[in-house]
């Protein structure tokens, strides 16, 4: 969904560029807090007050970080900084305290290559999972129709007047 804000309002909001990771600061449920998405749009976007923008840098790829936010290690860290009862929140200041494990921290070039490989593998798993999730119900529906067709064919005996004796 696209929506636009006035240029004046956009100046006051945080900018989101292609490859940035946007995290929710606030949610009514624990799973929604710090949920991440990688912005893939070509045009600059903006976000409001209940989101934090992670800008990838020379040490961490955006998609690597987004995948990391789905891990138990991240959730354990997030738990320590989540505040609230009805509405849960992790402030941008607290998010900055979360540590991101990166491979080969002493060799940034190698680290980024490994991160890219990890992202590639996880993207493939995600595509396969999505394919199965979307394709399986359709396949089940087709098999059900096939079953019904053959069942009806096998159980459609000739009517008594058609039977030659």
Residue positions per predicted region:
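Charged, alpha-helix-forming regions
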Residues: 1-165
